[in-house]
From Swiss-Prot:
Enzyme class: hydrolase
Keywords: Hydrolase, Nucleotide metabolism, Nucleotide-binding
Function: Catalyzes the deamination of dCTP to dUTP.
CDD domains in UniProt: trimeric_dUTPase
Catalytic residues (positions): E139
Keyword Acyltransferase: no
Claim: Hydrolase is one of the keywords in the record: yes
Record text on subunit structure and interactions: Homotrimer.
Name of this chain's protein: dCTP deaminase
């Protein structure tokens, strides 16, 4: 497997709709206000995706048990805003602004941005498999004993694109993966 460079990412985004909307280059300042942003957009060997304005913040209001086989959404509070406050030692789910369409010979890995990591916020996103498409559901954990703020429409994680040496026998789309074409924040289900 080899990692793909900015020229390839740009070509695939513009000619094949691999990333929509696509920011051609790193955006780190709001063009209207001049305010500094946590960067997003095309980088040398990846693409920094953004958080949308929709969040689900974990809460234990109902004294629930977290069970991935029998998950209930009442463990979350839904928020739509430009920022989200994650309680201490808790987490939030969000989704990307960008919609991704992954080619059959590509697998991605997603790594949290250092700006958030240095604040004790850990981003977890599973790989985008060959021929997966959709908005990315993103998990952000606050490992600190203090509340933490995350920002909508700013960078949260970098997607790295790896080209396989050989084509896979069965793609995510062909095996009818359960998170194919997900819209918005998708909670776990079996």
């Amino acid at each position: 497997m080899s990692i793909k460079e900015d020229k390839w990412i740009r070509k695939m985004a513009l000619a094949h709709g691999m990333i929509e909307p696509f920011a051609d280059g790193q955006v780190n300042v709001d063009a209207e206000t001049g305010e500094k942003l946590i960067s997003y957009g095309l980088s040398s060997y990846g693409y920094d995706l953004r958080l949308s304005r929709e969040f689900k913040v974990f809460t234990n209001v109902y004294n629930s048990l977290v069970d991935p086989k029998h998950f209930t959404e009442d463990t979350f509070i839904s928020i739509t805003d430009d920022v989200c406050i994650i309680p201490p030692n808790s987490f939030a789910l969000a989704h990307s602004v960008e919609y991704f369409r992954i080619p059959r010979n590509i697998l991605t890995m997603c790594i949290g941005k250092s700006t958030y990591a240095r604040c004790g916020l850990i981003v977890n996103v599973t790989p985008f498999e060959p021929e997966w498409e959709g908005y990315v559901t993103i998990e952000i954990s606050n490992t600190t004993p203090l509340p933490a703020k995350i920002y909508a429409n700013e960078g949260i994680a970098q997607v790295l694109f790896f080209e396989a040496d050989e084509m896979c026998e069965v793609s995510y789309a062909e095996r009818k993966g359960k998170y194919q074409k997900q819209q918005g924040i998708t909670v776990p289900f079996v």
